Design a protein with these regions (language model features):
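Regulatory nucleotide-sensing modules
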Residues: 1-20, 24
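Short beta-strand segments in beta-sandwich/barrel cores
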Residues: 8, 26-31, 49, 73-74
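Conserved beta-strand and immediately adjacent loop positions that scaffold enzyme active sites
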Residues: 18, 28, 40
């Protein structure tokens, strides 16, 4: 699947039931502070997985928003808890 710059893979608070492999492009992991400033906490690049690991592993709502930094292609891997 292809994502354009600025497209969100996941929003903070969404269930995290997937991970993906980055074929091209890159992604940033963003959290917002109480004064609405953006804080980048991580990146995923070509050849890496893009996933909010703690929330994926423990089946919790996402703690971060994951955003494409450029046109990017990923391979999705889904998991059904339960």
């Amino acid at each position: 699947m292809v994502y354009c710059k600025g497209d969100q893979l996941e929003r903070e608070g969404d269930p995290a039931r997937w991970m993906a492999f980055v074929e091209s492009g890159c992604f940033k992991y963003v959290n917002r502070s109480s004064d609405d400033r953006e804080h980048i906490t991580w990146f995923s690049f070509v050849g890496e997985f893009v996933v909010d690991y703690p929330t994926f592993l423990y089946d919790r709502p996402s703690q971060t928003t994951i955003v494409a930094m450029m046109t990017s292609r990923i391979l999705w891997l889904f998991y059904n808890f339960g």
